[in-house]
Amino acid sequence: MLIIAIVFYGLRWKGISKSLIESTLVNSMIMFIIVGAYFFTYMIGSANIATKLHDVVVNFGLSPWQVILSINIILLVLGCLIDPLTITLLTVPIFVPLIIQIGYNPIWFGVVFVINTEIGLITPPMGINLFAIKTVFNISTGELLKGVTPFLMIEIVFLALICAFPALSLWLPGTMIGG
């Protein structure tokens, strides 16, 4: 980004100071999110939320597939509204213990989680990658949505395949570990 700024706009002290101020503000917001997520995680651990969530799942008689479908829906909705870092910090402490307790592989869930957040990056209204593409290429929102829709559909099909056939995402890590 720095090289692009230098090539296209030149390097001036006014631009550097503005960039430093903006990056400081962005980093401050990120640090507040991380600190808030740390306290949120601590409260979740202290309140034993993961165990209580597991008990709710058992009491409702939800099958593991219904649980993962519910988690996928929650992550997709959150991906439309919140950035991936915040989603990760807020949901991982809740979902990972539940996933392990119902018998899913945590590596597989990690892949499913990343695919969900990738989908969130290209899903309106909060898709961060959409804002970046719209800004860089100066295209209309309609044109952008028309261009991203096929990729969004492919990602959703890919997510469904990974959920239906976990071996697709576990084969490579298994060969790396030697299993």
Go through each PLM region and give its residues:
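Alpha-helical transmembrane segments of multi-pass membrane transport proteins
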Residues: 1-179
